[in-house]
Amino acid sequence: MFARILALVLAILMLGSTAYYLIYMLVISVAAETPLYYTAANDDLNIRVGLMYGDGVTESFETTTVHGYTVGVQPLQDGVYTYTPFWSISGNRVVVAADKNLTVKDGVYSAAKSTDAVYVGGYHIEFHTDYSIADMAAAEQTRQNLDAVLSASGMYAFPVYKNGVIRLRVGSFSTEASAAAAYPYIAGIMSYFVSEIAAPSETSVTLLDAESGRILMEYDSSDGTSLGLSARDTLSAENAYIKTPVQNVYDGVMAYTRYAEEGIDGVAVTNVLTLDQYVEGVLPYEISSTWPMETLKAFSIAARSYAAYTLGRHDSTYHFDLCNGGHCQLYRGAGRVDRNVKDAVKSTHGLIITYQGKIASTYYSSSCGGNTVSIGDVWGGASSPYLVAHETPWERYSEYTNGFWTVEISPTELLNYLREQKGFTQLKGYIADISVLEYAPNSTYVKKLRFTDAYGNSADVVNTDKVRSTLGAYLKSANFVVGRGSVTYTLDKVEIVGERVIDSKTQKHVLAPVNAASAALSSAGVFVQTANSLESASLASSLILTDTGTVSAGSAPLYVQPALGELVSLAGADAVSTPSGAIELPRTVKEYTVVTETKTASASSATNFIFVGKGWGHGAGMSQYGAKDLADLGYDYEHIINAYFTDVEIVHYKTIPALDR
């Protein structure tokens, strides 16, 4: 009888409470101010980046943020990746854990070994309330009213997302038996709803307050979606981010999915964000943001192109596009993003590199040592016409910490390494000889290397990156010479001898008009013809607008938003000189000459092998340090890109049908 009276009171509260309206407005307003990532609503491409996956998952994952979180549904498998927020929480430190009995030690949540050690129980009483996510405000009102009734018992209610609807759960029990004992009382409170005991699920995750261990929500991802968390934004100028315990800071949405396969059970974490946000999180971890702006622009375009080319690489296995490591591109989020990074990415927004209308695979490495290598010689297989070997005489590799190196190895040490670490068990005695059988065509990279032991047994290594990885404990690239006791090598040094003026061609990429009233130029700069000269206005924060959707001299007024200042109206003689195609502007660059010295390096023992090498990495495509050297000489990003990739074009990714690769 008591339970039925409580149920009636609760129903009246649900129907008549003013708090319902207030909470509804709160949830709606929070959702409205939260940054969303709808591909259809902006010009950005949303991508998925794996942060924790496969055997790297843990049973729980903690994050913090300043203003709390927005909670939503994040699809990872529908090809759209539209984040739909439906709730918010004010806590600024949360944990997402596998749905199971949990214990906590030193702030880390993990599976409890026994019921005696349970801190957060995995069994609950579930009510089939079946609210839609659009009715989350009503679900929240019911939850709060239910909490008021349960307060004396020490239990509380929380929502669970399950197959597209929101249900309510009560309690945190360590066993089914303890849940069953509490069931009659709890089920009787809302007897007008079907209820049941909910056991831990291998498709669910639990959202916890990190400090108290209180369950905030549970999420069952069996419908192919994931629990999405994004940092709640504020009206301040500072962006809101999510931070991990290792102090990496992330933009966009963090998507959590239960991963339970092949004896591994934990929480997979995927960062869903725009392509440009991703590029911002790659650039300062691959190169320094203090490098010249033209280098940053060139790298932004190369990184964006590589991401577009490899999009979906891990989809079939893990349901994300790219990993966050060197296998794809080194991505660590927004922690190092500064004004230079933002300007470089924004001024090249959407630009990618293509070859004959298809996205180019824009490989890059730290430095090449004065020569790149064709992609077919790196890993084998067919070569790409735009990834061929080039001399790069402008590269100051000898001035870089890892650009020029010397390594000495004893014959016995090398034998043990090759046998134990690399599996060359056919080698029986100390290494007596190392022979370079073949260099990659038009390159100084070693393509085929032979090791011969004291008994005449030999082992061959083919392809430049296999050569590099085989000796990876010692060498930084396959661009080397080797000798026993000593070796002769060449060393190049760049010397500036003067300056010259060149024509720098800058492409103008015109996007489709918006509402038939504006046109945006996506390029490094907008060139404005003033009364005195042709000047460049940065497109880092520029929109080019006209009344007709076209840009032409002497017609409708042209509005230019410079990086700083008010919107400026230009007309007549003060109009953009060319709306599309290429224009030629004078650019002063430094002239240089290369001085080559021939030297000899000697080992400490006449029996030891000595390697002298240049460059760091696989050597295909663009050299990061080489791109810096070209910018230091005065060249722009287009020249840099064309110096490393043959016969390519720079276009907006939206001009490529279905990201044709």
Each language-model region and where it sits:
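Conserved, single-site charged/polar hotspot
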Residues: 3-661
